[in-house]
Every structure is written in C-alpha cells, then in structure tokens.
From Swiss-Prot:
The gene is vma8. GO terms for biological process: proton transmembrane transport; vacuolar acidification. It comes from Schizosaccharomyces pombe (strain 972 / ATCC 24843). The modification Phosphoserine is found at residue 219. Keywords: Hydrogen ion transport, Ion transport, Membrane, Phosphoprotein, Transport, Vacuole. Its main location: membrane. Residues 208-285 are annotated as: Disordered. This is V-type proton ATPase subunit D. The lineage of its organism: Eukaryota, Fungi, Dikarya, Ascomycota, Taphrinomycotina. Residues 208-226, 248-263 have a biased composition (Basic and acidic residues).
C-alpha cells in the first residue's frame, strides 16, 4: 500500500532534487489548470444562459413565423411554395463558422451574414399577398438568425462540457494523486537520507574512537618499551658498579687471608725455639 502512495525510486540527493522539481511543476500545472477550469466554468455558465434565452426567443419567433406563413397561405393560396422557388435566384443568407479561444480551447461559433443587395422577392406577390410575403420573409430571417445562434451555443456547450470534464479530472488527479504521491516520495527520500546521515555519523564516531584507542595503545606500548630500555640501562649500570665492588671484596678477602697467615706463623716459630731450648737444656743436664 505504501509503495502505491509513493514513487519507486532510489533515495539519493539527485532523486530528491528531481522529485522537488516535479512537485513544483505539478503545483504550477495544478494552479494553471485550476484557473483554466474556472475560466471554462464561467464561459460554460454564460453559454447555458445564452442557450436558455435563445430557446425562449426561438419559441416566440417560430410562433410568429408560423402565423405569418399561415397568413401568406391564406392570401395566396397553395401556390406559395412554387412562386417562392421560382423567385429565388441567389442565396441571401450565408452562415460562416469561426473559432473562439477560451483558455486554449477553441469553440466553434456561427455567424449569419445577410446580403441586403440581393432581393429576389420584389416582384413576388404583386397580384395579391405581397405584404404578407414580405412580413413572413422578415420573420423567417430572424428565425434563421436565432437558429444559427442556438446552434453555435449548443456546439460550444457540448465541446466545452467535454473539455471542462477532462480538465476537472486532470485537476483532481493532480491534486489528490500526483501531488500527494510526490510529497510522500520526498518525505521517504528525506527520511532515508537522514537515516544514512545518522549511520554515517555513528560510523565516523566509531572510527574516531577506534583511532583514539589505537593511538592510546601505541602510546602505552611506546612508554613500556621506553621504560624497559631505562630498566635495562639501569641494570647495566648497577652491574658495572657491582663488578668493581666484587673485585674490591676479593682483594679484602685476600688481604685478610694473608694477614691470617702472618698471624699464625709467628706463634709457631716461637714455640719451636722454646722446644729447642728445652731440648738443649735437657741435654745439658
């Protein structure tokens, strides 16, 4: 259901720009079609009023024409059709078609042109009924003019009704389908882009934190390595100091041993002398 309410597009910034452009164009088109629909509705109402007036006028004119034709028939008898056909040489009334532009819609209009220079009924009815014939001719000229106007209004009414219906369908489709779908698509793309931005921000934070941890680990390793080097140097220094001390100790021990040897040798010598003296003394006695 959600896919039907928006366009199936890939959420990128280029697509977002395209959708915004399409939305702006749809809103502009909706505004123009709305104005066109209002202009067509106004003209349509005018045509409806003109049709009503033309129909009423047509009813009155045709009623008068029927009475005048009855008067001509009563005055001249049943030969009126034959006499009129024999009198007419050139057409006096001509109907021309034009087009009226209403908001880009071309409506057909009809106009009646009356050529006053042509009068084939001057000698018709000289014997009797000439006045009734002239009156009937004028009445039927008005009837034809009214018919032409009514035909023009009816044609415009039919064509304008179809165009107005089609325009209203377009306006409704743009207003209720196209614009909401584009708006939903834009909201979807913006939400997806925001989600991608949040993911990128989180990813960057993690990368930054990983780099900081790596830098801390490197600094700790360097400190430990530097501390081990200092300890080794101190050990070497202490070892170098111990070696002379050991030599000194050895010398002291040697001196002590030498002193012991000297001390013990002296008493032994005196004892031997005493023994010799005693032996000598014994020998003397």
């Amino acid at each position: 259901m959600a896919s039907k309410q928006r366009e199936n597009v890939f959420p990128t910034r280029m697509t977002l720009t395209t959708m915004k452009t399409r939305l702006k164009g749809a809103q502009t088109g909706h505004s123009l079609l709305k104005r066109k629909s209002e202009a067509l509705k106004k003209r349509f109402r005018e045509i409806v009023v003109n049709i009503e007036q033309a129909k009423q006028k047509m009813g009155r004119v045709m009623q008068i024409a029927a009475f005048s034709m009855a008067e001509v028939g009563f005055a001249m008898g049943n030969n009126i059709n034959f006499e009129i056909q024999q009198s007419v040489k050139q057409p006096r009334l001509r109907v021309r078609s034009k087009q009226e532009n209403i908001s880009g819609v071309f409506l057909p209009t009809f106009e009646m042109n009356l050529d006053e220079s042509i009068d084939d009924f001057q000698l018709t009815g000289l014997g009797k009924g000439g006045q009734q014939i002239q009156k009937a001719r004028q009445v039927y000229e008005k009837a034809v003019e009214t018919l032409v106007q009514l035909a023009s209004y009816q044609s415009a009414f039919v064509l304008l009704g179809d165009v107005l219906q089609m325009t209203n369908r377009r306006v409704n489709s743009i207003e209720h389908i196209i614009i909401p779908r584009l708006e939903n698509t834009i909201k979807y793309i913006e939400s997806e882009l925001e989600e991608l931005e949040r993911e990128d921000f989180t990813r960057l934070k993690k990368v930054q934190k990983t780099k900081e941890n790596a830098e801390k680990a490197d600094s700790v390793t360097k400190e430990e390595h530097q501390g081990g080097s200092n300890t080794l140097q101190q050990t070497k220094d202490v070892g170098g100091a111990i070696a002379p001390a050991a030599e000194v100790g050895k010398e002291v021990i040697n001196e002590v041993e030498n002193s012991k040897d000297d001390t013990y040798s002296l008493p032994s010598t005196s004892t031997d002398d005493e023994e010799e003296n005693d032996s000598d003394e014994e020998v003397i006695f």
